[in-house]
A protein has these predicted regions:
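Bacterial N-terminal signal peptides
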Residues: 2-15
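Long, contiguous binding/interaction regions
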Residues: 20-123, 130-270, 276-308
């Protein structure tokens, strides 16, 4: 019994030794504000927070958090930094972009944004996080994201159903020349709307090139009027471009609505982030131009066939 008690104490001590170093689990809990569990076989300490503040139903059935509505962050000893983390935050639509900004500002990476269910009420999204750095910084980043999420719900207990920027005009009258002049593109008008497409290329396992017309592209579509417009679109980014482009778009107030992949086995690996913005055509276009400039400044990998 004495030996068992000693082993339990060692396994659950504030600083847990692993084959790769040590994790101060007490500091993780205090830094994130969450309680966690230690998985000795993997050298991972995981903190969790069930989303039980707002009831969620899927296909008419009330979902308990155990069935996939729990935010979490897992910490392990890093390779080149003190710790590495991964995580998944359960968010409602009006929480996504404020929380994303908080995570990015705190030094975390946002690696995916998508849904896990159909017919969920209210709609739930999942934001995947990653990062390497000091334990203090990574834990503080997780806490900052969760504090921001709670602030959104404190201000409005029930999840919002619109972005809140009002409605764009029913009749479209976008001056496409404004967009082309800023982006250096030649876009396509359509019934007062305007769309630009910027192609990229990836190589597939067959040795074939997948190109702009096959879906490897960045695009932006504008509707409304020059003073009151909506822009939606998609940025095609290689992995190293994702975080800089996200930071640029969020810094300009553009909403990110999805981050995922469209293909498998392509080279270089291409990710797609979908966005939605409101405002005047000129400031919206300048926001996109800033993100494109940030993207172009990222050095390409040696095997990059992409052309922005």
């Amino acid at each position: 019994m004495a030996v068992s008690a000693l082993m339990a104490t060692l396994c659950w001590s504030a600083t847990v030794a692993t084959g790769f170093g040590a994790l101060d689990t007490a500091k993780i809990e205090s830094g994130t504000g969450l309680k966690g569990t230690w998985t000795e076989a993997e050298g991972v300490f995981k903190v969790t927070q069930p989303r039980n503040d707002v009831p969620v139903s899927v296909d008419g059935w009330t979902m308990p958090p155990f069935m996939g509505l729990t935010s979490w962050a897992a910490f392990s000893v890093g390779g080149t930094s003190e710790v590495m983390i991964s995580g998944d935050l359960v968010l409602f639509e009006d929480e996504v972009n404020p929380v994303m900004s908080a995570a990015l500002d705190a030094g975390l990476s946002v690696t995916a944004l998508h849904n896990h269910f159909f017919f969920d009420q209210p709609r739930v999204y999942f934001m995947h996080l990653g990062g390497e750095g000091t334990l203090d910084k990574m834990a503080a980043g997780v806490k900052a994201a969760l504090v921001r999420q709670k602030a959104v719900r404190a201000a409005q207990p029930q999840p919002g159903r619109v972005f809140g920027a009002g409605f764009a005009p029913a009749k479209n009258a976008v001056t496409g020349a404004l967009v082309d002049d800023i982006l250096g593109t030649k876009g396509q008008p359509n019934n007062g709307m305007f769309k630009i497409v910027i192609g990229r290329e990836v190589k597939m396992p067959c040795g074939c090139m997948m190109t702009k017309e096959m879906g490897v592209n960045t695009w932006a579509a504008f509707a409304g009027t020059d003073d009151n417009a909506v822009v939606d679109g998609d940025f095609a980014v290689i992995e190293d471009e994702l975080q800089p482009v996200l930071k640029s778009l969020r810094g300009s107030g553009i909403n990110i609505v999805a981050i995922h992949h469209h293909m498998t086995h392509e080279q270089p690996r291409m990710l797609f982030l979908h966005y939605w913005g409101r405002g005047g055509v000129e400031p919206l276009t300048r926001s996109l131009k800033a993100a494109l400039d940030v993207q172009k400044a990222v050095p390409p990998p040696s095997h990059d066939h992409a052309k922005a």
